[in-house]
């Protein structure tokens, strides 16, 4: 049996292969200025991910509107089973692998599976890993995360390898929205090397210079959210750094 990869995932893979890295902007549907954010990022992001850790109101309406404003692929990043809408293009079908609560490991995605099938949403199978300092953020609290210490990059690497053996094609190394500091470079590199699958990095990435470092270390996708909410115009410089790093990384890899 051949594994089928959907249109959105294929498009994202092509961006990563040709440009070295992709840029996702996370929009919380509960943010009052989501329209403003969508307008600012539409020319710079490769995709929009929609989600929040605490409650969601009017998800159908907000998702449809963001899709119309941006014209970009809209991917759901559900914080719970209610974070799914037929208005999206795809969903990050994920397991919060290092949660202390099996609800977030397996029960929540299982409960949402039939709804996803009913809506005909494309799924991107993904391991979601909570990295220090995620315990100080909303997702760390709600998801009861047994955070991976930054000083133990090999733990994230082994989780990522495990995810690849489970058949997942994406790993999200998450420091948490508004995190004091991002996932370190060594952890990104080890996770990429061991798993060989797409590595998404988010949380605490506030400057183009930091984004550049993360891509050069092995990140395939950079996610910004809080930064975008505070300064929507910052995405232009962020995109430049991510794409430059992507091309520099491709050149570096071609010489090996």
From Swiss-Prot:
Binding site for Mg(2+): 28, 53
Disulfide cysteine pairs (residue numbers): none
Tagged with keyword DNA-binding: no
Cell compartments where the protein resides: Cytoplasm
InterPro entries registered for this protein in UniProt: GGGP/HepGP_synthase_sf, GGGP_HepGP_synthase, GGGP_synth, IGPS_HisA/HisF
GO annotation, biological process: glycerophospholipid biosynthetic process
Keywords: Cytoplasm, Lipid biosynthesis, Lipid metabolism, Magnesium, Metal-binding, Phospholipid biosynthesis, Phospholipid metabolism, Transferase
Needed cofactors: Mg(2+)
GO cellular component, one term: cytoplasm
EC code(s) of this entry: 2.5.1.41
Main location group: cytoplasm
Reactions this protein catalyses: sn-glycerol 1-phosphate + (2E,6E,10E)-geranylgeranyl diphosphate = sn-3-O-(geranylgeranyl)glycerol 1-phosphate + diphosphate
Record GO terms (molecular function): imidazoleglycerol-phosphate synthase activity; magnesium ion binding; phosphoglycerol geranylgeranyltransferase activity
Function: Prenyltransferase that catalyzes the transfer of the geranylgeranyl moiety of geranylgeranyl diphosphate (GGPP) to the C3 hydroxyl of sn-glycerol-1-phosphate (G1P). This reaction is the first ether-bond-formation step in the biosynthesis of archaeal membrane lipids.
Listed name of the protein: Geranylgeranylglyceryl phosphate synthase
């Amino acid at each position: 049996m051949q594994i089928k990869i959907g249109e959105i995932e294929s498009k994202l893979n092509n961006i990563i292969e040709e440009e070295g890295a992709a840029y996702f902007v996370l929009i919380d549907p509960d943010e009052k200025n989501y329209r403003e954010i969508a307008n600012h990022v539409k020319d710079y992001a490769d995709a929009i991910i929609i989600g929040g850790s605490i409650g969601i109101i009017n998800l159908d309406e907000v998702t449809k509107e963001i899709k119309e404003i941006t014209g970009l692929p809209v991917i759901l990043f559900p914080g719970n089973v209610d974070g799914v809408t037929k208005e999206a293009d795809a969903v990050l079908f994920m397991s919060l692998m290092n949660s202390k609560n099996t609800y977030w490991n397996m029960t929540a995605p299982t409960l949402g599976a039939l709804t996803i099938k009913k809506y005909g949403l494309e799924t991107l199978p993904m391991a979601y890993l909570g990295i220090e300092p995620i315990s100080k953020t909303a997702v760390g609290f709600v998801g009861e995360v047994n955070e991976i210490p930054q000083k133990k990059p090999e733990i994230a690497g082994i989780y990522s390898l495990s995810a690849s053996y489970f058949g997942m094609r994406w790993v999200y190394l998450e420091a948490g929205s508004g995190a004091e500091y991002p996932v370190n470079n060594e952890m990104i590199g080890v996770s990429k090397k061991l798993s060989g699958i797409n590595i998404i990095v988010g949380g605490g990435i506030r400057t183009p210079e930091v984004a550049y470092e993360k891509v050069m270390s092995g990140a395939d996708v950079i996610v910004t959210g809080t930064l975008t909410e505070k300064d929507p115009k910052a995405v232009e410089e962020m995109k430049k750094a991510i794409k430059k790093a992507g091309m520099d990384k491709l050149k570096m890899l071609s010489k090996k």
